[in-house]
């Protein structure tokens, strides 16, 4: 009987608490006090630090902590054609607190384009060495599907997709394209995060 071996025996999700310097920089950017370039400089510095910490702890996988994101899942969806978002002050309750989320909805058919997350991955990949591999995390296709059929989005989604089957088909094709983009950029550890199970 053949033996199957995995790259390592433990793993972690890869989303880390944001350091204060990062939170301060994002707030300053939102308030117009610093430029996008200045924000990116801080983000890159903090990612470099968190990668160094993961290596120091002996992990064989490294992530960027999802430090570039505003939301763990929605930012990824914004990287496709046909998806728009705006901050309307709405949100969902999480641990008895209101988490303010950008409304994310369709304005056309879903199609892949050059996804910004692939560029984010390339920054992370430079830190790979003989002991570590860069991992990137994205929301699962089911998460994307769920976002587009929540009650607030259902009517808008139906303007572009008459059936769930058509919606699922386009999500699948778009994901295949973006996953190929990650592969071509050298990504060999792509994690799909799926929180839709809690809605079953």
What are these regions (language model features)?
Residues 1-200:
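Domain-level signal for soluble alpha/beta catalytic cores
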């Amino acid at each position: 009987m053949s033996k199957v071996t995995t790259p390592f025996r433990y793993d972690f999700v890869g989303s880390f608490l944001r350091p204060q310097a990062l939170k301060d920089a994002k707030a300053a950017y939102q308030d117009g006090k610093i430029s996008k370039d200045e924000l990116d400089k801080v983000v890159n510095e903090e990612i470099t630090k968190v990668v160094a910490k993961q290596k120091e702890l002996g992990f064989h996988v490294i992530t960027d902590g999802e430090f570039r994101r505003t939301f763990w899942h929605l930012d990824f969806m914004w990287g496709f054609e046909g998806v728009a978002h705006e901050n309307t002050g709405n949100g969902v309750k999480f641990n008895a607190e209101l988490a303010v989320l950008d409304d994310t909805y369709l304005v056309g058919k879903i199609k892949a384009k050059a996804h910004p997350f692939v560029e984010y991955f390339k920054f992370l990949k430079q830190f790979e060495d003989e002991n570590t591999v860069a991992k990137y995390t994205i929301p699962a296709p089911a998460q994307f599907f769920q976002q587009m059929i929540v009650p607030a989005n259902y009517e808008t989604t139906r303007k572009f997709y008459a059936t769930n089957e058509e919606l699922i088909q386009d999500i699948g094709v778009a994901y295949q394209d973006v996953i190929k983009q990650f592969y071509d950029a050298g990504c060999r550890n792509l994690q799909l995060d799926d929180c839709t199970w809690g809605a079953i």
